[in-house]
Curated annotation (Swiss-Prot):
Belongs to the adenosylhomocysteinase family. This is Adenosylhomocysteinase. Binds 1 NAD(+) per subunit. The lineage of its organism: Eukaryota, Viridiplantae, Streptophyta, Embryophyta, Tracheophyta. PROSITE patterns: ADOHCYASE_1 (PS00738), ADOHCYASE_2 (PS00739). One of its GO terms (molecular function) is adenosylhomocysteinase activity. It holds the Pfam family AdoHcyase_NAD. Adenosylhomocysteine is a competitive inhibitor of S-adenosyl-L-methionine-dependent methyl transferase reactions; therefore adenosylhomocysteinase may play a key role in the control of methylations via regulation of the intracellular concentration of adenosylhomocysteine. Its cofactor is NAD(+). InterPro entries: Adenosylhomocyst_ase-like_sf, Adenosylhomocysteinase-like, Ado_hCys_hydrolase_NAD-bd, NAD(P)-bd_dom_sf, S-Ado-L-homoCys_hydrolase_CS. The gene is SAHH. One of its GO terms (biological process) is one-carbon metabolic process.
Length: 485
């Protein structure tokens, strides 16, 4: 696809695959709104006061139908928005088209190359001569990463004239990041520094991006305040757990039509995502094995009736492999060579480094047979047997299906709206330093409460005597910060 920004008749910039899908996207957005009571409640509560008036928000988060409802909630509250996806396969093109036509600048399409992906990220951050965004909604931390790497390069350039060398790294994706920064130095050697100075803060959606933020906080390089949305209970214990429980089997069946019942499935990692995946596979009739490094998570798995073994113990016996760790080098090419014919290998962690795709792609004589988009059979020459890899080792639930359903994403995205409001409303107060924060418990409980009515749930009310007896306010919060749900 030619990397040229287009404009709507109203002058809004965009780059999507097919604007003719906008009407279809609008119909699905309207369906999703009914399933997203938290976001709709935000529009009702905050819309009249327009709290985001004057705010420029950049989003780097999967451009799906559910995200479209988030974007239109931000614009309904007064924000200007520019958006890109945080994964090359996760965009739903009809959602991107509808938002580009009706609401916000969008730069996203399904099946981007890595070069196109980083071009889209750069466009979403580009607010013209006035600098960058005021706020960032990030998922995985790529928008945050680009700004941090850009500022670091600009400081080096100002200090000693050093220009980033893309060949200084073997990582093909990071080479593209350095190339973008190198080119920006030619036209504006303070581009990312000006972005940093304008930024009020970022709210981060997922485990992987949160890890990046805490690493930067620990080494003193975090450039602006950050709110960790992922560790809100109404995000991690719902989106990560119940969302994956729904979307993993959806992706598996759309990609392969395989019958899960009776199969041996291995889930690498038993955190919230792993728990949801293992539950889905078990409920579908698979015999589930878990791999874990953490004895507590391993013990939890055994108490759920799951086997806890090492990958090396069972690699030749497993039919379906799912990585959920957020780590790297979990399934290597030497493991893949030992797998049974047509074993399915997939990842539901954020990045593509859990599965050794580079080792697979460069294995001597290996043959790649594309069955359909994001479903490939790789045949090894020495065994003449193959494995099926989904979404090229990236997020299979969004690459091969449509990701988490609207209701559970409403929980996550309501947290995002509240986090963005918190950062924006406190921008001049000094409340938030260059650190990582978590939303307070009373807001977590508010997000949950906004979703109960849709499910027909009714809360029991504490009397004053009961509340005093357990030392909590009648209206909450009901649990201490250290409580484990």
């Amino acid at each position: 696809m030619a990397l040229l920004v287009e404009k709507t008749t109203s002058g809004r910039e965009y780059k999507v695959k097919d604007m003719s899908q906008a009407d279809f996207g609008r119909l699905e957005i309207e369906l999703a709104e009914v399933e997203m009571p938290g976001l709709m409640a935000c529009r009702t509560e905050f819309g009249p006061s327009q709290p985001f008036k004057g705010a420029k928000i950049t989003g780097s988060l999967h451009m799906t139908i559910q995200t479209a409802v988030l974007i239109e909630t931000l614009t309904a509250l007064g924000a200007e928005v520019r958006w890109c996806s945080c994964n090359i396969f996760s965009t739903q093109d009809h959602a991107a088209a509808a938002i580009a036509r009706d609401s916000a600048a969008v730069f996203a399409w399904k099946g981007e190359t890595l070069q196109e992906y980083w071009w889209c990220t750069e466009r979403a951050l580009d607010w013209g001569p006035g600098g960058g965004p005021d706020l960032i909604v990030d998922d995985g931390g790529d928008a945050t990463l680009l700004i941090h790497e850009g500022v670091k390069a600009e400081e080096e350039f100002a200090k000693n004239g050093t220009i980033p060398d893309p060949n200084s790294t073997d990582n093909a994706e990071f080479q593209l990041v350095l190339t973008i920064i190198k080119e920006s130095l030619k036209t504006d050697p303070l581009k990312y520094t000006k972005m940093k100075e304008r930024l009020v803060g970022v709210s981060e959606e997922t485990t992987t991006g949160v890890k990046r933020l805490y690493q930067m906080q620990a080494n003193g390089t975090l450039l602006f305040p950050a709110i960790n949305v992922n560790d809100s209970v109404t995000k991690s214990k719902f989106d990560n757990l119940y969302g994956c429980r729904h979307s993993l089997p959806d992706g598996l069946m759309r990609a392969t039509d395989v019958m899960i019942a009776g199969k041996v499935a291995l889930v690498a990692g038993y955190g919230d995502v792993g728990k949801g995946c293992a539950a889905a596979l078990k409920q579908a009739g698979a015999r589930v094995i878990v791999t874990e490094i953490d004895p507590i998570c391993a013990l939890q798995a055994t108490m759920e009736g799951l086997q806890v073994l090492t990958l090396e113990d069972v690699v030749s016996d497993v039919d379906i492999f799912v990585t959920t760790t957020g780590n790297k080098d979990i399934i290597m090419v030497d493991h893949m060579r030992k797998m049974k014919n047509n074993a399915i290998v997939c990842n539901i962690g954020h990045f593509d480094n859990e599965i050794d795709m580079l080792g697979l792609e460069t294995y001597p004589g290996v043959k790649r047979i594309t069955i359909k988009p994001q479903t490939d059979r790789w045949v090894f020459p020495d065994t003449n047997s193959g494995i099926i890899v989904l979404a090229e080792g990236r997020l299979m639930n969004l690459g091969c299906a449509t990701g988490h359903p609207s209701f559970v994403m409403s929980c996550s995205f309501t947290n995002q709206v509240i986090a963005q409001l918190e950062l924006w409303n406190e921008k001049s107060s000094g409340k938030y330093e260059k650190k990582v924060y978590v939303l307070p418990k009373h807001l977590d409980e508010k997000v949950a409460a906004l979703h109960l009515g849709k499910l027909g749930a009714k809360l029991t009310k504490l009397s004053k005597d009961q509340a005093d007896y357990i030392s909590v306010p009648v209206e909450g919060p009901y649990k201490p910060a250290h409580y484990r749900y």
